[in-house]
């Protein structure tokens, strides 16, 4: 024991180190507070395993203490209603739990007396005491309102400066009745006056006390909203339940939703409330603005209804340009067809004296058959009619006048000499394209109908049948996907379609689209999945359970740094590490501190006397002695690394006999040495095998 005077002693529960707050238990220890003012010894706080132990587990130097906090809280079930205080030192914070509040206050007072600590300035107890007295005095501030109203309103409406100043009752009543009079009288008006009187007073009588109260409130908002309420509902007593008048936006929105007729001055509007009536005009203007806008919109909507719907690009050109007589009749008939083909129209005035057989006899070029992939229209030939003679034009357009068959799905003809009846209209138009190609244009120009610059072709795309034929080429190639074109019935390559230089090349299908989905090998039956790797965190566990924190009743004590400077760390304080409490797992953490191990000469001093054969002080010395024996006694014939492996156990030595030269005497000596140390025998029993090794 130290030689200081015992100031205080008792049982306290001590916390483990901060990094072990969650993993280790808070153990009950016997604490002794010693003062060395009379004896010259340092002021220390010692704790023992029990009250009759002779050697302390640890000595806390109070000269290194920085602060003491009392009344902490800890979010743990066993410490919910405990009395916790801490001793904050340079090395560590000790959290101590007392059995009662008196016991805690006694320990804190004694420690503060020895250390010379004073309460800190940021003590939260004083503001709590002042604030707790304020609501008690505030109900006596004003007695103009009922008791229930005053108790509810005074903590909110009174400024905080009046709560802090303690004045006599009568001057306090007079002083507080001037400034917050607006709010108090407004509440009184709500509670005292009945609904009919209140309604009539606000709309007709300007001399009543209630109206005078409203004059103090922003009156340019309240009368306008109340007037509109009166015009709609006939009473507005429920609106006055608000503490402050509603905003203009709220009143306008309510009026516009309920108001049907323009406002007038038929209500009893007072001359005093002229700003309110002025604002009513402003609200009338605001209200009429949406109605005017809606009337304009209604007119525009009426115009848009009478006006036809804007036509689609296919319906833009309803009357083609200068066409022959047959062309005009045929194109005007086709232009009126909507997007979905209607029933077959009546026969035109031109006679259909052409049969499908005559169509097959018309001369064709090699690329003529490729034109079957384009839907012919009446608008395509006129753009090229300047290159055709008059006789051929009349003949060919008589053939084109019989183009009225869109009901049969078109298929690719297997033979050039025979075609279906549904192809007779296409074949006749192909004759036009064939004659046009003779006039100096290439055979690949048969795909010129895909040019989007031709207006009749844009129109013709509006009544085509892209659903019935997948190989259909639209007249606007900008929106057509050539990757899917010709996948079902591809055109022959010898007809020149694929080799056409002006036809966009077919985009190859991406390989990623054809790949199968990835295989989930975890779905195989009887598959042994690898276990997920364990997430080993360094030391985050102590962060999950926070240390005891400050509470509203926490009191902090610290010394004045100007009057009591911190003394340097003494070297003789931490010399009591070893004790009879060797099984205390939390205290085994203390010698791992580098400062303690370097300053304590008796910790490992006995090991160096006998060359590692002294009595065991800590079980940590096993590895040190074992590695010293292996390093110093490694034979010359074998490297030290293999000698270590051979000495790790009998099984390892037996395995390496086949290919490593092993000294049997050294192997047995190392084996017996290891068994002696692991069994916890005395050093005298292990001296014989150790010397035999040497």
Swiss-Prot record:
Biased composition (Polar residues): 205-230, 456-465, 594-616, 685-694
Entry's Gene Ontology molecular function annotations: signaling adaptor activity
Protein name: GRB2-associated-binding protein 1
CDD domains: PH_Gab1_Gab2
Pfam family, any one: PH
N-acetylserine found at: 2
Ranges where the record places region Disordered: 125-147, 194-230, 324-386, 441-471, 491-658, 671-694
